[in-house]
């Protein structure tokens, strides 16, 4: 289990995620997993929660769709979600993906949905609700922070509450064009 949080703020979109991998409900198998990656010529950043093998499959599918649609993230995400919804094998995948580029911030769910957040914040994983609430609070009341600082602190707060999230946090960001 994990927590991934992405924030779009002041011309920057950032993502933060912890590195904990849990087997079952109680065994911490790893604390430094890389759940945030750059794809499509480093123009798209993704973060995932759920089964690692499932997430890698979704990453490969999204990369293929990005290649097919010349890097158009919104179109690639919709096409990926449609494939995910129609394919019985893909429907069994248990993962969620946050994807963003210099224009869009999207959540691609296991139900084949593509959502753009209302408050410029999206969070997934076992600590996702905690991170999302923390990030929205910081966006509303904490001036002077960057998107990256907000995302990282939101995951830190989630890690304080959620036993399946650790404090080994990795961040990445893209400036809007």
From Swiss-Prot:
GO terms for cellular component: HslUV protease complex; proteasome core complex. The active site is at 2. GO terms for molecular function: metal ion binding; threonine-type endopeptidase activity. Signal peptide: none annotated. It comes from the Bacteria. Disulfide bonds: none annotated. SUPFAM superfamilies: N-terminal nucleophile aminohydrolases (Ntn hydrolases) (SSF56235). Na(+) binds at residues 159, 162, 165. It catalyses: ATP-dependent cleavage of peptide bonds with broad specificity. Allosterically activated by HslU binding. Keywords: Allosteric enzyme, Cytoplasm, Hydrolase, Metal-binding, Protease, Sodium, Threonine protease. It is found in: Cytoplasm. GO terms for biological process: proteolysis involved in protein catabolic process. Belongs to the peptidase T1B family. HslV subfamily. Protease subunit of a proteasome-like degradation complex believed to be a general protein degrading machinery. A double ring-shaped homohexamer of HslV is capped on each side by a ring-shaped HslU homohexamer. The assembly of the HslU/HslV complex is dependent on binding of ATP. This is ATP-dependent protease subunit HslV. It comes from Lactobacillus leichmannii. The gene is hslV.
